Amino acid sequence: RFFKMDYKIRIVRYLYFFSFVSLLILYLFPGSLIGYLFYGDFSRQPDIIPNPLGTSINHTIAFFYLSILGLISYMRGTSFKQTLIFLVVVSLILELSHLIIPNRSFQYSDLFANLLGTLLAIVIIFLYKRLKNGKI
């Protein structure tokens, strides 16, 4: 079945899985790898986009990106709903893992930002499907 799938969807799935593994590494590492790359300091979180929300915007962007890839990857099959549930559960588990990982801290604002990124992706996919089917 995998080899019969459209090559564009296959590329999106590869990108989704690569992005998911990258997100796991970034989330579960005790400290900020990106902070180390930018500032030489594992304890510093960079702001991708300067804003009043601080680093939580990074979470929204990351989960929006991951959710868009995941939902596009499985848009045609029954796995769409399973992918959606998976993304929400991963969001919760990853942020809760910061309670036990050294040099990381659980923050409700980050959890909200994770879920917001996933929700924005769902809305965009929903609107795209309706537009594609001529219902908008």
What is each PLM-predicted segment?
Residues 2-109, 115, 119-136:
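Bulky hydrophobic segments
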